[in-house]
From Swiss-Prot:
Biased composition (Low complexity): 247-263
This protein's name: Autophagy-related protein 22-2
Biological role stated in the UniProt entry: Vacuolar effluxer which mediate the efflux of amino acids resulting from autophagic degradation. The release of autophagic amino acids allows the maintenance of protein synthesis and viability during nitrogen starvation.
Subcellular location(s) of the protein: Vacuole membrane
Lineage: Eukaryota, Fungi, Dikarya, Ascomycota, Pezizomycotina
Length: 607
């Protein structure tokens, strides 16, 4: 729906900070209700990210495949009658079973190959993030225009929640359909967060607490569906880049030591709180999930299938995601962008042609964004670092859950407690890192580097088990289940800091007026890289039969972004972004002038 601007006599109009930049722009001051609408979606989807993707989905996929799999050497079923791990009554519930076949791989046949059941989960998530990257590229750039921002957010939220709920119908014989649901759910999750991120600069820009310069805003104009500008789209005047360093440049490695801008401070505060609230919701649902698992273990349900209790948990997660998405639907304003012309001058365009044109526009818009980004050194360096860092984060998360389940032989209940530990730590980290950063005067990139250094502890500690003396002891190096819990605290604290700081730090470098397009590039970089790590670890598992071998890949991967983050200069990046906006504006003005002169020449010749 189209959101009408406030009437001139309304209280909201009196608080309006700036005039609209294009016809139909909603410049209503951001309200607390609207911010809570933004928070609500994080509360909704973070539950699926943590409880689903982060813990129970990998376990469910692995267990579904395991119940159809056989041991590689003996060819006996991994679960069920005749299995070495089967209990006296012929069943082996997933939440209670500890495999006795210590030195044999459980494999499942797929496409003519025997795949380790743990690798099956890793490969599924690699495919999921690949599809996710293609999807968000195709749709998220459209969020800058009309009401697409909110429409896409709700569509991804409702479809994603449905996939989680549908898991209750996935039995072991159709475990491949479970992989399909994972691909759809993960795709919707990541794509929706991209659109959610694009709301953040808009909410900050319209917040009453942000003081605006007393100058007229540049008008934003429509863009044609073929990706060409009808008129320059820019929100900053030329004086922005000529006025010297931007005050927001507190987070770089340059010489600036000035305070952060009000916009960056507010953006970081909202972002950090959003991450923290999401973690709070995830902890609550995780506790409910463990309670549900424990209750079902006392019934005959777990004897029907070892995955059935897990599938009930995913049903609960899907219901939660759907419910809070409804809150976002009610409270978050659409904040429409400039119009995107889809009509043909010859008449009504067929619907499928309109969508093809829009998807083509999205890819063309991304390509234009890439061409702009490669001219912005600080953006390019940060994206290179983010490519490596996001791959490391995704790989560690997936590997840790499967490591706990297959190497440490932890029950599903203990894995759930492990996830709660990491989530609580992540919640603390989201609120703690801004305090630490202010207390010690750390710039944003220095805070990110500190998080990365702590993150490196995880794979290094896991590799200690290869040292003969520790291996002989049977402890140290993640050889005992209790050892993984302190590392879960480290993982949570680090992830909480990286999630909020990387998102807000990148927002500082974005050319004004291109928030959704650049956050699409940010997410495409994230998801594009996250295809690589899990797939490589999956191949290592297939080759060695051990999840632990993945640490040899993860350890150097985590360290590689540090020098890149160090050299990012936020002050310079902000100036480059504003200067790029000016060049684009001048280029579009020249193009429009040439088109006008050509038209006048044709008219003069009577054509």
């Amino acid at each position: 729906m189209t959101v009408a601007p406030p009437s001139p006599n309304s209280p909201a109009a009196e608080l309006q900070q700036r005039p609209p930049r294009y016809p139909g722009e909603d410049t209503t001051p951001t309200s607390k209700r609207e911010i809570w609408g933004w928070y609500a979606y994080g509360i909704a989807a973070e539950v699926f990210a943590v409880c689903g993707v982060g813990s129970f989905l990998p376990l469910t996929l692995e267990q579904l495949a395991r119940e159809q799999g056989t041991f590689k050497s003996s060819h006996l079923p991994c679960v069920g009658p005749g299995s070495p791990s089967t209990s006296v009554n012929g069943t082996a519930p997933a939440m209670l079973r500890r495999d006795e076949a210590e030195n044999d791989q459980c494999v499942v046949g797929l496409l003519g190959l025997n795949i380790n059941t743990a690798s099956f989960a890793m490969y599924t998530f690699s495919l999921a993030v690949l599809v996710q990257a293609l999807t968000l590229i195709s749709f998220s750039a459209l969020a800058d225009y009309e009401n697409n921002r909110k429409t896409l957010l709700l569509a991804f939220g409702f479809i994603g929640s449905a996939t989680s709920m549908l898991f209750v119908f996935i039995a072991p014989p159709i475990f491949v359909l479970g992989a399909l649901l994972v691909v759809i759910g993960v795709t919707c999750l990541g794509s929706s967060f991209v659109v959610l991120n694009s709301f953040l600069p808009v909410l900050v820009a319209n917040d009453p607490s942000i003081e605006k310069a007393s100058k007229p805003a540049e008008e934003l104009h429509p863009m044609s569906p073929d990706g060409e500008y009808i008129h320059p789209r820019d929100s900053f005047s030329a004086s922005d880049a000529e006025s010297g360093p931007h005050p927001a440049a507190e987070a770089g490695s340059g010489t600036s030591s000035g305070p952060a801008s009000p916009e960056l401070q507010l953006s970081t505060r909202i972002s950090s709180k959003g991450v923290g609230l999401g973690y709070c919701a995830a902890v609550l649902v995780q506790i409910l999930s463990i309670s549900l698992l424990f209750t079902l273990s006392k019934t005959s349900i777990s004897k029907v299938s070892g995955t059935l209790p897990l599938r009930f948990v995913l049903l609960l997660v899907g219901i939660w995601w759907f419910s809070f998405t409804m809150v976002t639907r009610k409270w978050l304003r659409a904040r429409p962008g400039p119009p995107l012309n889809t009509a043909n001058t010859g008449g009504q365009v067929k619907r499928w042609r309109v969508w093809l044109r829009l998807v083509g526009f999205a890819w063309k818009s991304l390509w234009k964004t890439v061409k702009i980004a490669v001219q912005l050194r600080e953006v390019l360096v940060f994206l290179a670092a983010w490519f490596l860092l996001s791959d490391a984060m995704a790989t560690v998360s997936g590997t840790a859950i499967l490591f706990a389940r297959t190497e440490l032989k932890m029950s599903t209940t203990l894995v759930g407690l492990l996830s709660i530990t990491a989530t609580l730590s992540g919640m603390a980290g989201a609120f703690l890192w801004p305090v630490v950063s202010r207390r010690f005067g750390l710039k944003s990139n220095h805070t990110i580097m500190l998080c990365i250094a702590l993150f490196e502890i995880i794979p290094l500690y896991g590799m200690l088990a290869y040292i003969p003396v520790f291996k002989k002891w049977g402890v140290i190096g993640l050889q005992q289940p209790w050892e993984i819990f302190p590392l879960a605290i480290v993982h949570g604290v680090v992830s909480g800091g990286l999630s909020s700081y990387c998102r807000s730090f990148f927002g500082l470098l974005i050319p004004p007026g291109s928030e959704a397009a650049f956050y699409a590039l940010y997410a495409a970089t994230d998801k594009g890289s996250s295809v690589i790590g899990p797939a490589i670890v999956g191949m290592l598992i297939d080759a060695t039969g051990q999840v632990r071998s993945g640490f040899f890949f993860i350890a150097p991967l985590i360290l590689m972004p540090i020098p890149l983050i160090w050299i990012v200069n936020a002050e310079k990046g902000r100036r480059e972004g504003v200067a790029m906006a000016q060049r684009l504006e001048k280029g579009h003005e020249t193009e429009m002038s040439e088109q006008t002169e050509e038209a006048e020449g044709l008219l003069a010749r009577g054509i």
